[in-house]
């Protein structure tokens, strides 16, 4: 069976933990989109890790981890991540990298940095990982596929073409030194040597695995609201964040995806710019940020303080719908145990009218949150294993959210560890 783990909101929902947990019973874990611009935090017996490109199955010796064709592949970072976990006592993971994946080049990162600098106060809040320039090149058909690293004549011709294309912009718009074909060839040769042991036709591998009845877990990055088509455009990422894209980014038939686990926090958080209707500020936000996550709410990639807010039923209902959700995993519920009452955003007021439908960005910028307040439970719920053992007000909070988003909450995370999970109403 193929199942996907994806995000309902702006990313940072806790997908890494849920993937790590579900991976125990999987044979293969696949990253199918995005790059090193977001991190998945995992806490296990080896310690606490922030993975940026490696699939979250790397901590299990029985799993084959696949980086699919849809990923923005930063080869030095992948190799560094592998070495980083091995240095901390994790056995070397089984890893396959698609021969059709495309490569994040050093000039993609340079262009990303230069453009953010040029835009100044109107920037997109990029992590400066080269993602937008990478995908721009991919769809302009001037990117480098992994398979091309092994064809020297093709590389020699292509690097000259890249220099001719990029240098006018570098020199005249950004006032930076020109690229040289020699330097680009040297960079590509170093990438070839690094990636060679892992390269495979991963689409064929996955096709055969599915045919044999293997359990495949597709691991998404970011969340529905960062999708370039359906999210808070233009403050979005550059690849689709939806489970449906898993078929494309991994190279498997769409009808094989039987289960979609959509992860949502019990409150809201976001990194980067863009509309965030239930956002809170000041001491209220600082307190939630300090208590949140595992060691505070700070970006796994940038270390930036995350923007904080209360749970948003409007955004989460929309995000779950887009993902084709079969199950919701509700995370970091334990964080809210300090509150006397908990506000939940149940609607948006736009131009004097209240809606429960998620609008396009122009209207979203004008939206004001409509809150209902629920009583808190004022205790620590870590260590609880059964739903019935949760405090009554905690159960009421879960059931209130479930009713408003319209999708079943079947997993509740009440701590950072693998074992901190409560299963509920699973089919």
Identify the meaning behind each predicted range.
Residues 1-427:
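Non-transmembrane, aqueous-exposed alpha-helical and coiled segments at domain scale
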